[in-house]
């Protein structure tokens, strides 16, 4: 299959054999693709190598045969966000999450748009924690494993003042006892879940519980094996948490 002048975001790049690269990209029309960029060493290929960097938005042409395609041409369409510190680690996180959860060639049209929006939020450092929670919600919904964020697992509308455990398969389950602080630590309030459902930024105090709750859900869908970016962010923050 010939792919011509398709736009994509670069997710990951690694060496492939002696002079080539394996480039993972996210496209709107074809989903996630793995492309081999051959012979990219040398001064003449400097512009191409610069375009094939994580977070870069590119236009490319390729020939797709089997699992991996052959990259024929690529050019940068903008300047990739220049990130540092926790924002840079957040970019590693969203890319690793995509690589681990989204299979190649799966139709993910809406996720491409969500990635584009998250990339711009990272560029402007706009409500980082909230931006990541929105992206996590979008990736789960795109993969068909999201859940209703307005009702609990029994179909009862969420109480904004209550606390809920997020069951990876059934959705929010109300915490029966509000007095156990250890249990409440890993729960999300009804208020923050409703905010996530409607994409309305909540009170900052609710975001820590939502982060831990979403991590448990993601860990389930990751087969119990965590992300390297979680470890990097934990080291950066000196605590064992996900972004």
Swiss-Prot record:
> Which keywords are on file for this protein?
DNA damage, DNA recombination, DNA repair
Write out the function statement from the record: Involved in DNA repair and RecF pathway recombination.
Swiss-Prot/TrEMBL GO biological process terms: DNA recombination; double-strand break repair
PANTHER family membership = DNA REPAIR PROTEIN RECO (PTHR33991:SF1)
Official protein name in the record: DNA repair protein RecO
Q: Which family does it belong to?
A: Belongs to the RecO family.
Gene3D superfamilies in the record, alphabetically? Nucleic acid-binding proteins, Recombination protein O, C-terminal domain
Supply the NCBIfam families for this chain.
Answer: reco
Q: Name one GO cellular component term.
A: bacterial nucleoid
């Amino acid at each position: 299959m010939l792919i011509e002048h398709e736009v994509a975001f670069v997710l990951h790049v690694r060496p492939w054999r002696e002079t080539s690269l394996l480039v993972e990209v996210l496209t709107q029309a074809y989903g996630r693709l793995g492309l081999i960029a051959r012979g990219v060493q040398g001064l003449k290929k400097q512009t191409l190598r610069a375009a094939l960097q994580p977070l870069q938005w590119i236009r490319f042409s390729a020939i797709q045969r089997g699992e991996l395609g052959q990259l024929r041409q690529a050019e940068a369409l903008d300047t990739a966000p220049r990130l540092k510190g926790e924002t840079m680690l957040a970019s590693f996180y969203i890319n690793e999450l995509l690589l681990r959860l989204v299979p190649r060639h799966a139709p993910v049209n809406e996720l491409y748009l969500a990635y584009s929006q998250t990339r711009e939020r990272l560029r402007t450092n706009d409500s980082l924690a909230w931006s990541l929670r929105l992206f996590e919600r979008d990736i789960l919904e795109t993969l068909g494993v999201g859940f209703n964020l307005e009702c609990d697992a029994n179909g009862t509308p969420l109480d904004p003042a209550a606390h809920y455990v997020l069951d990876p398969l059934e959705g929010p389950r109300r915490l029966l006892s509000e007095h156990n602080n250890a249990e409440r630590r890993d729960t999300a309030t009804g208020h923050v879940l409703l905010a996530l459902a409607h994409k309305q930024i909540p009170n900052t105090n609710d975001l820590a519980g939502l982060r831990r709750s979403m991590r448990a859900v993601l860990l389930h869908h990751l087969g119990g094996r965590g992300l390297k970016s979680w470890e990097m962010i934990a080291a950066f923050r000196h605590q064992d948490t996900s972004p």
